[in-house]
Design a protein with these regions (language model features):
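Short, solvent-exposed beta-strand/turn "edge" segments of beta-rich domains on protein surfaces
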Residues: 33-35
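Short, conserved turn/kink motifs that form compact alpha/beta structural patches or helix kinks used as
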Residues: 2-17, 28, 37-40, 47-156
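Short, Lys/Arg-enriched N-terminal segments with co-localized hydrophobic residues
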Residues: 21-22
């Protein structure tokens, strides 16, 4: 998979998304391109569960690139109760910070943005499928930074 080239910061959809998040479209696009081109970014596929039927098959959103930047570190001003609520009985070691960018060009029908609840499937170095869940995300001019919760259950 190779990311699509999209260097038009004036695309109407891009301008609308950046305006809604109060972001500079050019800076945000540069950050997006940096993630897509980063040598350590991994190819992945995103899936979105059906909000109305959790037993239904997830919708395949498409290809993306994920750039893991490290273990998730909760803000230093969080108290113990906030940390417990955020991790919700999950092992904090399973939470990672990562930038996620859709491989499709902005403005195309294939373009999407990762959202809380999406599933991220990537391949490990040994060829195993690794699943993560988008637990949280925030968009800034540095990109779409997501907190991913690794699914530690084997797929097969």
């Amino acid at each position: 998979m190779s990311p699509q080239e999209d260097s038009n910061p004036h695309d109407p959809l891009w301008l609308q998304m950046c305006a809604a998040a109060d972001l500079d479209p050019l800076r945000r696009l540069q950050a997006r391109q940096a993630v897509l081109r980063h040598p350590q970014a991994q190819d992945c596929t995103l899936y979105r569960p059906d909000e109305d039927d959790y037993e239904a098959e997830e919708e395949e959103l498409g290809d993306a690139r994920v750039l893991f930047v490290g273990a998730f570190e909760p803000p230093s001003d969080w108290d113990e109760a906030e940390r417990l609520a955020y991790f919700d009985d999950c092992d904090p070691a399973l939470f990672f910070s990562a930038y996620v960018e859709c491989a499709a060009a902005v403005g195309t029908a294939a373009f999407f943005m990762a959202e809380i609840g999406d599933h991220v499937a990537s391949m490990t170095a040994d060829g195993q499928v690794q699943m993560h869940f988008v637990h949280d995300c925030s968009e800034s001019e540095q990109g779409l930074l997501c907190v991913l919760l690794r699914d530690d259950q084997p797929l097969f």
